[in-house]
Curated annotation (Swiss-Prot):
Originating species: Chlamydia felis (strain Fe/C-56) (Chlamydophila felis)
Family: Belongs to the RuvC family.
Gene: ruvC
UniProt-listed SUPFAM superfamilies: Ribonuclease H-like
Assembly information from the UniProt record: Homodimer which binds Holliday junction (HJ) DNA. The HJ becomes 2-fold symmetrical on binding to RuvC with unstacked arms; it has a different conformation from HJ DNA in complex with RuvA. In the full resolvosome a probable DNA-RuvA(4)-RuvB(12)-RuvC(2) complex forms which resolves the HJ.
Protein name: Crossover junction endodeoxyribonuclease RuvC
Signal peptide: none
Gene3D superfamilies: Ribonuclease H-like superfamily/Ribonuclease H
GO biological process: DNA recombination; DNA repair
Cofactor note: Binds 2 Mg(2+) ion per subunit.
InterPro entries noted in UniProt: RNaseH-like_sf (IPR012337), RNaseH_sf (IPR036397), X-over_junc_endoDNase_Mg_BS (IPR020563), X-over_junc_endoDNase_RuvC (IPR002176)
UniProtKB keywords: Cytoplasm, DNA damage, DNA recombination, DNA repair, DNA-binding, Endonuclease, Hydrolase, Magnesium, Metal-binding, Nuclease
Keyword Transport: no
């Protein structure tokens, strides 16, 4: 039995997504990944629309068994929190319209699942994801969001493995 898990690191300018294939007990492979890059010149409404359309296209091509997002956290700037929350809402809606369950994990929980420490740096997450899944290009400077998305998907694979395997 296999399972596809999609992690998404949401953003109003860049959203990373990563899909892993989970086979048997903890056998995890990278399936596909990418970054949705939006223009700061576009209105927020236009960016949300483009984010929705792009992630919908990915979900139509590859229907994962679960979508995983970071939990909402509060920025120092309340407007940033609201804007990010709206981007998350667009992503949740895209999954919900396809009856794909959505799960959330705090960033420190996802980091702990991959690096072993909840306060790991983005570079440490990139390095561990690269090594775990044998994807050297995730080490590129512009792939932090993709590495975070992989970390979320891996976190869910580890957290849900007992339910996935029918073990409690």
């Amino acid at each position: 039995m296999t399972q596809l898990i999609m992690g998404i690191d949401p953003g109003t300018l860049v959203s990373g997504y990563a899909i892993i294939l989970v086979e048997q007990r903890y056998k995890i492979r990278a399936h596909s990944y990418g970054a949705i890059r939006l223009s700061s010149k576009d209105s927020l409404t236009q960016r949300y629309k483009q984010l929705f359309q792009t992630i919908s296209g990915v979900l139509n091509d590859i229907t994962p068994d679960a979508v995983v997002l970071e939990t909402q956290y509060v920025h120092k700037n309340p407007q940033s929190t609201i804007k990010l929350g709206m981007a998350r809402g667009v992503l949740v809606l895209a999954a919900a319209l396809r009856d794909i369950p959505v799960f959330e994990y705090a960033p420190n929980v996802a980091k702990r699942a991959v690096v072993g420490r909840g306060n790991a740096s983005k570079q440490q997450v990139q390095l561990m994801v690269s090594k775990m899944l044998n994807i050297p290009d995730v080490l590129n400077a512009n792939c932090e969001d993709i590495a975070d998305a992989f970390a979320l998907a891996i976190c869910h694979a580890h957290t849900s493995s007992y339910d996935f395997l029918g073990v409690r």
